[in-house]
UniProtKB/Swiss-Prot annotation:
Family: Belongs to the Fmt family.
E.C. numbers: 2.1.2.9
Organism of derivation: Thermus thermophilus (strain ATCC 27634 / DSM 579 / HB8)
Name of this chain's protein: Methionyl-tRNA formyltransferase
Broad EC category: transferase
Listed GO CC annotations: cytosol
């Protein structure tokens, strides 16, 4: 089929790569270049870089309602468009152009976790199960009817990166199956109570030791790779790069013990073992080395700004 692809982050690149091996990608649409790095120089998105490297037709419109973009989409004459983490709602003027509409690969069990951060929000909420949905876009936020759904348990130590990649990879399989049979398929309306998954804020990475160790571990897994989890010590931000819950009890925010494996901190329920950290302005280091260098010992209180 003639396919237009809409996507932006690195997560979406394997979707585009799989599509171009089975179908004719007639247009790639990604978000405009954004400032990146220390110099804040405009840089293309990962999807745009891939499209340029592979010689695929590429557009980076600021607004999808612009007539110049809509005309370019018409001229590309896609039979269907595929969306994977594009980052903007597609207006009706564009939705109506491909004869078979727009398909969206969404990593949740719709109608649960509509929006930008479904994987992260499912982890934060402590969901035991999630999945991926292939849907037909309408004008709403992930409200369109479903072509295919795949369910899976969330593995105990999966973070947002690993879970998101696993859901994407299965989603690619589903997407290709749907495209093979698209003319004969009829999508079904979403059923059940809807929930929403807004983007994460930087503050949501902060570890509050007044929560349980299990909740803190869920938070740590959910906020990878951005914003990452962190806490404060003596007014400085410390990134928590690796951690895990431990059995036992301790006073929330107070170091219970320090050993070769790391720093054990009390929480509202259970203990949290810090394995690797990165103090503000410093390199990553084992938590035990950080404790020695920064005077962290049993009885030290963490988490205070």
């Amino acid at each position: 089929m003639r396919v237009a692809f809409f996507g932006t982050p690195l997560w979406a690149v394997p979707v585009l790569d799989a599509l171009r091996k089975r179908h004719q990608v007639v247009l790639v649409v990604s978000q405009p270049d954004k400032p990146q790095g220390r110099g804040l120089r405009p840089a293309p998105s990962p999807v745009a870089r891939y499209a340029e490297a592979e010689g695929l037709p590429l557009l980076r419109p600021a607004r999808l309602r612009e007539e110049a973009f809509l005309e370019a989409l018409r001229q590309a004459a896609p039979e269907v468009a595929v969306v994977a983490a594009y980052g903007k709602l597609i207006p009706k003027e564009a939705l109506d152009i491909p004869p078979h509409g727009f398909l969206n690969l969404h990593p949740s069990l719709l109608p649960k976790y509509r929006g930008a951060a479904p994987v992260q929000r499912a982890l934060l909420a402590g969901e035991r199960e999630t999945g991926v949905s292939i849907m037909r876009l309408d004008e709403g936020l992930d409200t369109g009817p479903l072509y295919a759904v795949w369910r899976t348990p969330i593995l105990p130590d999966e973070d947002a990166v690993a879970l998101g990649n696993r859901l994407r990879d299965k989603g690619v399989e589903l997407l290709l199956e749907v495209l093979e049979r698209l003319p004969e398929l009829t999508p079904r309306p979403q059923e059940g109570e809807a929930s929403y998954a807004p983007p994460l804020s930087k503050e949501e990475g902060r570890l509050d030791f007044g929560e349980s160790a299990e909740a803190l571990y869920r938070r740590h897994r959910a906020v990878q790779p951005w914003p990452g989890s962190y806490f404060f010590h003596r007014g400085q931000r410390v990134k928590a790069l690796r951690l895990r819950p431990e059995p036992g009890e301790g006073e929330p925010g107070v170091v219970a013990r320090v050993g070769p494996e790391g720093v054990v901190v009390g929480t509202a329920s259970g203990l949290l073992l810090l394995l690797e950290v990165q103090p503000e302005g410093r390199r990553a280091m084992p938590a035990a080395d950080w404790a020695r260098g920064y005077g962290v010992a049993p009885g030290t209180r963490l988490g205070q700004v």
